[in-house]
Amino acid sequence: MITVSAIVFVRGDGRVLTVRKRGTTRWMLPGGKPEAGERAIDTAVREVHEELGIEIAPEELELLGAFDSHAANEAGQGLRATVFTTRRVVDPVVQAEIDELRWVDPADRDPDQAPLNLEVVFPILTGTARRS
């Protein structure tokens, strides 16, 4: 099981920031794996700074939830993602291991999106999540 933290950045037009890491084909939320002893929220803050040059304080984030899914780029691996959201206006810059970024409509069913986005996060954002 891979553990990650991520942030959903939502623009005023409802589009969500996604990134594609170098050497991969799937689009995912900005974020990444924790360092030893790091809290999920601190991981998310650190990763978006490293990947996109975005400085954001933990107080600016709201917990969307902790979700299980499938890793986008590591076949056969499970994923445990703690996901935060913010409507803070950001101007991301591609850095570190990020190759590209794009703002997407979460209602679109782009098959190049990571399973976490398609199966969990985007349905929550669009109000189409299945209720158990």
Describe every region a protein language model picked out:
Residues 21:
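Short loop/turn segments immediately following the C-termini of beta-strands
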Residues 29-64:
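The catalytic Nudix box helix
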Residues 9-10, 18, 86, 103:
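Conserved hydrophobic "DFG−1" position in protein kinase catalytic cores
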Residues 3, 53-91:
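Active-site segment of metal-dependent pyrophosphate-handling enzymes
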Residues 34-39, 74, 79, 98, ...:
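Residues at secondary-structure transition points
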Residues 24-25:
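A short acidic/small-residue loop/turn micro-motif
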Residues 1-16, 33:
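Conserved N-terminal beta-strand and adjoining loop/helix that marks the start
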Residues 83-85, 93-128:
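NUDIX/MutT-family hydrolases
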